[in-house]
From Swiss-Prot:
Binding partners and assembly: Heterotetramer with KCNB1. Heterotetramer with KCNB2. Does not form homomultimers.
SUPFAM superfamilies per UniProt: POZ domain, Voltage-gated potassium channels
Gene transcribed to yield this protein: KCNS1
Lineage: Eukaryota, Metazoa, Chordata, Craniata, Vertebrata
Protein name: Delayed-rectifier potassium channel regulatory subunit KCNS1
GO molecular function list: delayed rectifier potassium channel activity; potassium channel regulator activity
């Protein structure tokens, strides 16, 4: 905390003048400060040449009026030239009229550098403060970047430009790798909803167990089981596509259709069908449990991972509903069964989305999602570059190869060749044969290397940034003292606004008392600057 202590003085006349040098170091000019707002007494509230006693976080100093008058544009210079107590109060955080004490709640370390500035006229960068905190302190005291010493200015600007936020100035995410207070407070606000809920402590503990794999040993076991079920479901879907299973199940389906029965019950291998039922039961248990334990139902349906969980089980239940609806209508003909088979195939294809469930247990996949969310500008630029390059080189290739009958018959047909060439994939299914076509292909490949590499570098840097932030956020949630937070939640409802205000005032009085107890450690007569 910073405190400016002003000793009591005799007052001067109603109007006074203070000689202030120009900020650029020119000839001194005589500036009229202000007029005293007490016309009946005709005396000024303090002498213009009186020293200021300064207390910054327990560090007390006396600042001479001559030193402050050299820099009238700074906060202390304007305070020294203040013509009334009311004007001075607007420049400080608090003022004790009895002790003539001005109070500032600022960084004491920066104030020591500020004293050096008033002595020498040059401000040096403090390594103990980050560049943004240093800049905020300098702005508060009325110092600009021009006040920086030449030896520190280049280093300050370099550190300011090399901050983590420099790579993403348009992003709305915090620049630090550490989780910001807003992210932690969002988690705490979600947990605070359990305070007034029924069985809040138990629901909160179960919700953290299911949502945070590193929360406890049971949560790690639950995560391992969930990952195993997801992998088993994906493996069953892949095995089902093997030729031997396809031939056997196709014959059984034809026989079922001929008998007027639904082919759904015979298309699956019995072992794979039982495994599918088990996976569906587990996924349904996960979704229903998370829905019941969620602190907010509305936020539950807004979370992307929860939507993925719902989509993973939705095809199975839609297939059952389609079968029941067809059975209620009495449709046993081949046309209805054929439509049902197409619907079932579409629903089966949706099972591939189950692989996205792994994102709940993978920091890398969640970081990838956050990267794509905050990289839409870079992705748009990448697609724009590709579209321009494909259009240009496809037209050139069509002009050079249209007479050769090698697949470049139309410009839209050349788009496929241009896309695989610019992305340096090069399937080789369509290749130019003329010299002009080969030159166009070479330019297309080189242009793809240069154009695609530029946005990809930015996207990769963002992925690394979000990955570190996600790891830090998980560590912060995992290492938080949950028991203390639960005790806090249990007492929130009993605290009224009046008691909160009383606690706030008591805390401020305690802080002032702590500062007063530190005062004797300072010399009784601070050094004059």
């Amino acid at each position: 905390m910073l405190m400016l202590l002003v000793r009591g003085t005799h007052y001067e006349s109603l109007r006074s003048k203070v000689v202030l040098p120009t900020p650029l170091g020119g000839r001194s000019t005589e500036a009229l400060v202000s007029e005293c707002p007490i016309p009946d007494t005709g005396i000024r509230w303090r002498q213009s040449d009186e020293a200021l006693r300064v207390n910054v976080g327990g560090v007390r100093r006396l600042l001479s009026a001559r030193a402050l008058a050299r820099f009238p544009g700074t906060r202390l210079g304007r305070l020294q030239a203040a013509a009334s107590e009311e004007q001075a109060r607007r420049l400080c955080d608090d003022y004790d009229a009895a002790a003539h004490e001005f109070y500032f709640d600022r960084h004491p370390g920066f104030f020591l550098g500020l004293l050096h500035f008033y002595r020498t006229g040059h401000l040096h960068v403090l390594d103990e403060l980050c560049v943004f905190a240093f800049g905020q302190e300098a702005d508060y005291w009325g110092l600009g970047e021009n006040a920086l010493a030449a030896c520190c200015r280049a280093r300050y600007l370099e550190r300011r430009l090399t901050q983590p936020r420099a790579w993403d100035e348009d992003s709305d995410t915090p620049s630090s790798v550490d989780p910001c207070p807003d992210e932690i407070s969002d988690v705490q606000r979600e947990l605070a909803r359990y305070g007034a809920a029924r069985c809040g402590r138990l629901r909160r503990r179960l919700w953290l167990t299911m949502e945070n794999p590193g929360y406890s040993l049971p949560s790690k076991l639950f995560s391992c089981v969930s990952i195993s079920v997801v992998l088993a479901s994906i493996a069953a879907m892949c095995i089902h596509s093997l030729p031997e299973y396809q031939a056997r199940e196709a014959a059984a389906a034809v026989a079922a259709v001929a008998a007027g029965r639904s082919p759904e019950g015979v298309r699956d291998d019995p072992v794979l069908r039982r495994l599918e039922y088990f996976c569906i039961a587990w996924f349904s248990f996960e979704v229903s449990s998370r829905l019941l334990l969620a602190p907010s139902t509305r936020n539950f349906f807004c979370h992307p991972l929860n939507l993925i969980d719902i989509v993973s089980v939705l095809p199975f239940y839609l297939t059952l509903l389609a079968g029941v609806a067809l059975g209620d209508q009495g449709g046993t003909g081949g046309k209805e069964l054929g439509h049902l088979g197409k619907v079932v195939q579409v629903f089966r294809l949706m099972r591939i989305f189950r692989v996205l469930k792994l994102a709940r247990h993978s920091t890398g996949l969640r970081s990838l999602g956050a990267t794509l969310k905050h990289s839409y500008r870079e992705v748009g630029i990448l697609l724009l570059y590709l579209a321009v390059g494909v259009s240009v080189f496809s037209g050139v290739a069509y002009t050079a190869e249209k007479e050769e009958d090698v697949g470049f018959n139309t410009i839209p047909a050349c788009w496929w060749w241009g896309t695989v060439s610019m992305t340096t994939v090069g399937y080789g299914d369509v290749v130019p044969v003329t010299v002009a076509g080969k030159l166009a292909a070479s330019g297309c490949i080189l242009g793809g290397i240069l154009v695609v590499a530029l946005p990809i570098t930015i996207i990769f840097n963002k992925f690394s940034h979000f990955y570190r932030r996600q790891k830090a956020l998980e560590a912060a949630v995992r290492n938080s003292n949950h028991q203390e937070f639960e005790d806090l939640l249990s007492s929130v409802d009993a605290v009224s606004e009046a008691s909160l205000e009383t606690s706030r005032e008591t805390s401020q009085e305690g802080r002032s008392a702590d500062l007063e107890t530190q005062a004797p450690s300072e010399p009784p007569h601070p050094q004059m600057y």
